[in-house]
Curated annotation (Swiss-Prot):
<feature type="binding site" description="in other chain">
    <location>
        <position position="55"/>
    </location>
    <ligand>
        <name>L-methionine</name>
    </ligand>
</feature>
<dbReference type="GO" id="GO:0005524">
    <property type="term" value="F:ATP binding"/>
</dbReference>
<keyword id="KW-0963">Cytoplasm</keyword>
<dbReference type="InterPro" id="IPR022628">
    <property type="entry name" value="S-AdoMet_synt_N"/>
</dbReference>
<comment type="similarity">
    <text>Belongs to the AdoMet synthase family.</text>
</comment>
<comment type="function">
    <text>Catalyzes the formation of S-adenosylmethionine (AdoMet) from methionine and ATP. The overall synthetic reaction is composed of two sequential steps, AdoMet formation and the subsequent tripolyphosphate hydrolysis which occurs prior to release of AdoMet from the enzyme.</text>
</comment>
<dbReference type="GO" id="GO:0004478">
    <property type="term" value="F:methionine adenosyltransferase activity"/>
</dbReference>
<keyword id="KW-0808">Transferase</keyword>
<dbReference type="InterPro" id="IPR022636">
    <property type="entry name" value="S-AdoMet_synthetase_sfam"/>
</dbReference>
<dbReference type="GO" id="GO:0005737">
    <property type="term" value="C:cytoplasm"/>
</dbReference>
<feature type="binding site" description="in other chain">
    <location>
        <position position="282"/>
    </location>
    <ligand>
        <name>L-methionine</name>
    </ligand>
</feature>
<dbReference type="Pfam" id="PF02772">
    <property type="entry name" value="S-AdoMet_synt_M"/>
</dbReference>
<keyword id="KW-0479">Metal-binding</keyword>
<feature type="binding site">
    <location>
        <position position="274"/>
    </location>
    <ligand>
        <name>ATP</name>
    </ligand>
</feature>
<keyword id="KW-0067">ATP-binding</keyword>
<dbReference type="InterPro" id="IPR022631">
    <property type="entry name" value="ADOMET_SYNTHASE_CS"/>
</dbReference>
<dbReference type="Pfam" id="PF02773">
    <property type="entry name" value="S-AdoMet_synt_C"/>
</dbReference>
Length: 419
């Protein structure tokens, strides 16, 4: 019998995502000026206020208030009517030095002996149902909001959009786990109060989302996904009605509260650790990226159409306590999942320092991860500029989303004799 699966996304202007982006912007600035910085930055945003907290060990000092304000303005919170704007909000910093007890357990004279920054389990997932090896419902949900943000910034076809928005997509699957049709799409978008008649205002918003936004999204998708769109899709557009009050004025936002949006939309699994604001010594982040890298390369190499990788660590310990692989009963090799995991250990070095080196994680690459998902994006090289009142301006060339590279496919094929 066919079944339904749903995933959601939230925009860069969602309160929790504002917090994530501020935390990762702070992390990037610390790493830009001191690549060995140890950082754990948390952010809370609410009406007219930003609170920064956490622990840092670094040889650089930053104007953290201005970094936070720049992020808020970049997102689009620039008007007093929003009750939260980069130029006028208060920014309180409670950031202090990292605990010596934690530092001594993680840091080693020999980098290869670097211990894990915490205990825990991390997961990486990949599926061949999309070109970027991501779950389809989540991929479409992200694309809806990315395009909505473009429309907001363009300010031409839809002029009333504000930064806060959410999306959700429900897809019907066959018994063979093949997507057959899109059943429902939910879009909630903050907007200006542009009409005294609330019913007329909502009617226009619905019309614009269905007739302007959705066709723009659909054009970006491969033909087999476009065919899933149909005349029977149920659209829920701003289903509560008016959505003028939004952003941090409508709901407080915190770093690390959108971990499913950040990863696989409910597919696969999640170990519970959030990513944003954490330097790569925190395996919550680095090992989750490395596990995605493994899963994606395994699927791309043809080991299985869908793969889940789990890795676990003990704080201060160099080697993982476990590595496992789950192929959902669709393994294309003659090996058991346990045997596949043993080969994975031979191919991928999962010591924290090796992950950092392999994926180039000690670079300022994290602000771009903090909205619309940490996984599934195209690896690319960019030039970034950072400025400190104490050290001046520097330029850094970095590579983003290295864990999305298919650079181990040949090694996997050789190891599993899939050539």
């Amino acid at each position: 019998m066919a079944y339904l699966f749903t995933s959601e996304s939230v925009s860069e202007g969602h309160p929790d995502k504002i917090a994530d982006q501020i935390s990762d912007a702070l992390l990037d600035n610390f790493l830009a000026f001191d690549g060995e910085s140890k950082v754990a930055c948390e952010t809370m945003v609410t009406t007219g206020q930003v609170v920064l907290a956490g622990e840092v060990r670094s040889n650089t000092y930053l104007d953290v208030q201005n970094i936070a304000r720049d992020v808020i303005n970049d997102i689009g919170y620039t008007k007093g009517a929003y009750k939260f704007s980069g130029d006028s909000c208060g920014v309180i910093s409670l950031i202090h030095e990292q605990s010596q007890d934690i530092y001594q357990g993680v840091d080693r004279g020999n980098k290869e002996e670097q211990g894990a920054g915490d205990q825990g389990m991390m997961f990486g997932y990949a599926t061949n149902e999309t070109e970027n090896y991501m779950p389809l419902a989540l991929d479409i949900s992200h694309k809806i909001l990315i395009e909505l943000a473009k429309l907001r910034r363009e300010g031409k076809e839809i002029e009333y959009l504000r930064p806060d928005s959410k999306s959700q997509v429900t897809i019907e699957y066959s018994d063979e786990n093949v997507p057959e049709r899109i059943v429902a799409i939910v879009v909630s978008t903050q907007h200006d109060d542009f009409d005294a008649d609330d019913e007329k205002m909502l009617t226009k918003i619905k019309k614009d989302i269905i007739e302007i936004l959705i066709p723009r999204v659909k054009k970006q998708l491969p033909e087999y996904v476009q065919k899933l769109f149909n005349d029977d899709i149920v659209y829920h557009i701003n289903p509560t009605g008016k959505f003028v009050i939004g952003g941090p004025h409508g709901d407080a936002g915190l770093t690390g509260r959108k971990i499913i949006v950040d990863t696989y939309g409910g597919k696969g699994a999640h170990g519970g650790g959030a990513f944003s604001g954490k330097d790569p010594s925190k395996v919550d982040r680095s090992a989750a990226y490395a596990s995605r890298h493994i899963a994606k390369n395994l699927v791309a190499a043809g080991v299985a159409p869908e793969i889940l990788v789990q890795v676990s660590y003990a704080i201060g310990v160099v080697e993982p306590t476990s590595i496992s692989v789950y192929t959902y009963g669709k393994n294309n090799t003659d090996l058991s999942d346990g045997q596949i995991a043993e080969k994975v250990k031979e191919i991928f070095d999962m010591r924290p320092s090796s992950i950092e080196d392999r994926l180039k994680l000690r670079n300022p690459i994290y602000r771009e991860t903090a909205a619309y998902g940490h996984m599934g994006k195209e690896p690319r090289k960019v030039t970034k500029i950072f400025e400190s009142p104490y050290k001046g301006k520097i330029t850094r060339e970095v590579e983003l989303f290295t864990w999305e590279k298919l650079d181990y496919v040949d090694k996997v094929k050789d190891a599993f004799e899939l050539n």
